[in-house]
Amino acid sequence: MRIISGSAGGIPIAVPKTLLRPTADRVREAVFSMLGERTEGAAVLDLFAGSGSYGLECLSRGAASCVFVESDRAAGPVIAANLKKAGLTGGTVATAPVESWLKAKTGQFDLIFADPPFLKQKGDRDWDAVLLASEELTGLLAPGGVFVLESFAKSAQPPPPGAPWSCAVERRYGDVVVRLFLFSLPAPDAAAPGPADL
């Protein structure tokens, strides 16, 4: 894995030994192609950060700050080491369960990334449902912000009825689906947002 572009482009990303499914470079490259210049000056939140690859990419591309949230204690030092190796500033690592952190946090972010454990078998947590129904998460997204959710393609869930999310872009890459959500409470006859809204 590596940082794809920006001031730290090409620098390898160390991965925690406990991380089973790091986001592939080609998926991240596609995501940032869709986001365009939105990273410049952005306040970023990287949930289920793992190696920190999404947040590192944002900082490399000019984001003002990034909070990396990851419950695995082994990941925090790895993210910190990745930041140092890449010479990136503005990164803060929070070692905490995502749900607990969301409930305690205030402030707003222009870009929120979430790459939770996949729902692959009975008994796995349905993080799509949890995140898309989270009032705490919607409260953290700044006006005009984007929520990027990476999911297992076979179990990706739409927002629950009444949830204020509109899916602007959806792309599948093998077993992975990436969706870009906008916070929206449209009128009943309003047109659904599309890529042009990003």
Show where each model-derived region lies.
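Class I S-adenosyl-L-methionine-dependent methyltransferase catalytic core
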Residues: M1-L198
